[in-house]
């Protein structure tokens, strides 16, 4: 394997959330990550959960994440830290969330105060956790669920940001977030926000006649064209990010609702590769062909269907093989380590929330309440990495079940 694939196999999971919800210490789950043969891990590190305000850490959260990161270093697992929540200034309807006030670059505006708080928050975070090699400074900002107007979720949700408004705001946020990270830890690398699919209902602005996953390339073109326009903070993409991230999920090409795009998907083929190559073509067009790419989320949900579980294990191996032969890809983070049964109590993506049946069954292992038993995709990934670890045993030792 060539040098840029040394950290190719990755996996993501909000392990501190799992510790808080289910009592098993977060760092113990890293034995599952290592058992899979993965040496990269994407950690949910929300600014608003680790910090009380942009300069003050929550001591409990600081201790938890430090434990997790210390264990990752012991196991030689590289960590990408990701946050998709931030603080908002007094005068906004919300104190925090995925929201921003109306874009207003006037000094002292609520919008500028929010950007300044974002910069300071990232400075604090990067300084607190020098163990984190890469900071992914946003998540799916091309979608309404992850970037919307202040107070949106408490409204009838009929007036999201337009795609142009979202991309303008995303460029601003990346610039200020990157400044903060580099102030806090000049040695850390900054990954762009990670765009995902685009549909008319979910947001993103992709013309309706394209397959939804070309929303990634579309979003990147919108971002790059703004940076290079001379109308934003800098025309140098390095001032916004060092690496580029995106989410190349496999979706059905059938005409279905947004909620069902994950369901009963077809076998990934060269079209899946081209979704990714199209995004990279955008990078090259704007002079960024030398930057590495993190595929920070991709995976499959079988919704508890045994036939889908078996089929998707094969699909997972196929996309790993494709990605291994994409020279620009540094790491592929499989989503996600664990099933989460609690997702059944949450609303789904069509309500701009993350929950429902499809969100339960992305896991490589069962929910801890079911013993963290390896599922078919876990064995498929272990086969790809060459791991001979006893995944059943690791799960039993972890949960005592």
Model-predicted segments: where are they?
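Hydrophobic faces of well-ordered beta-strands that scaffold small-molecule active sites
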Residues: 7-13, 41-43, 79-83, 133-137, ...
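Surface-exposed substrate-engagement region within the catalytic domains
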Residues: 118, 267-356
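Aromatic-rich peripheral "rim/lid" segments of glycoside hydrolase catalytic domains that contact
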Residues: 146, 152-161, 311, 326-401
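Noncatalytic carbohydrate-binding groove/subsite architecture in carbohydrate-active enzymes
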Residues: 164-309
